[in-house]
């Protein structure tokens, strides 16, 4: 499981590099922004239930299926730089989905674990719905410029169908009638857990007085 966040950090860096052409830097967007400026889904800022492996696995599954669908919608983007990065990332994301599915399939075979999987699904599903909420008023531009080939509603439907088919096949009850979580995140409205998480996430950068993110290899030597 530890390989997945390492992959995702690498993917994030690819996207940060892609927008540098517009005058942004990874440092300014990530480490030097204020926590209230972030517009991500609140699914990723919720604390894990201590000792609950089901929570981690279900969260990974719900997120990775959404990410897989989003990447599919970017494969034929009108922007070459997006298409190129999508092809690089897609293979690893396919593995992430398979890995999460494999763990869920194994856990539902245990009477105790299946209850924890269901509880995690009930808790996390409303927050997973926030992955398909719009960010500001840019959604119409995303569609108009051909950046994505699917709308958020289409991606949501594809995600829900895929998640429901897999999980109901394991005799899990998918809460498809759940309302989206109160705190969406993509509208800058975060949970109380986000500010302390951001503080921890950026503490090394601040305490070490860094002004440039560390890279393993210079871009010219890749």
Predicted regions mapped to residue ranges:
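Internal, conserved structured core segments that host functional sites
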Residues: 44-99
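Amphipathic alpha-helix face/heptad-repeat signature
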Residues: 4, 56, 60, 89, ...
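Acidic/His metal-coordination segments adjacent to aromatic residues that form catalytic metal sites
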Residues: 32-60, 110-111, 124-149
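A contiguous pocket-lining binding segment that forms or flanks enzyme active sites
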Residues: 81-143
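Extended, helix-rich structural scaffolds rather than catalytic motifs
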Residues: 115-222
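Conserved alpha-helical segments that form or flank metal/cofactor-binding pockets of metalloenzymes
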Residues: 2-34, 100-105
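Non-transmembrane, amphipathic alpha-helical segments
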Residues: 52, 56, 85, 113-116, ...
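Generic structural signal for well-ordered, non-membrane alpha-helices
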Residues: 10, 62-69, 95-102, 126, ...
């Amino acid at each position: 499981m530890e390989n997945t966040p390492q992959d995702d950090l690498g993917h994030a860096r690819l996207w940060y590099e892609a927008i540098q052409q517009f005058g942004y830097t990874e440092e300014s967007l990530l480490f030097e922004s204020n926590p209230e400026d972030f517009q991500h889904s609140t699914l990723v800022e919720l604390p894990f239930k201590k000792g609950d492996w089901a929570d981690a696995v279900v969260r990974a599954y719900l997120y990775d299926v959404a990410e897989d669908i989003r990447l599919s919608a970017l494969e034929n983007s009108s922007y070459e730089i997006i298409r190129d990065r999508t092809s690089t990332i897609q293979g690893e994301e396919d593995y992430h989905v398979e890995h999460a599915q494999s763990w869920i399939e194994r856990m539902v075979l245990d009477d105790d674990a299946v209850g924890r999987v269901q509880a995690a699904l009930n808790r996390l599903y409303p927050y997973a719905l926030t992955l398909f909420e719009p960010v500001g008023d840019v959604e119409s531009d995303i569609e108009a410029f051909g950046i994505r080939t699917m709308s958020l509603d289409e991606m949501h439907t594809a995600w829900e169908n895929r998640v429901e088919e897999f999980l109901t096949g394991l005799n899990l009850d998918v809460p498809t009638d759940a309302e989206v979580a109160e705190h969406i995140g993509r509208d800058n409205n975060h949970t109380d857990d986000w500010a302390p998480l951001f503080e921890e996430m950026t503490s090394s950068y601040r305490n070490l007085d860094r002004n440039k993110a560390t890279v393993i290899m210079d871009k010219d030597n890749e």
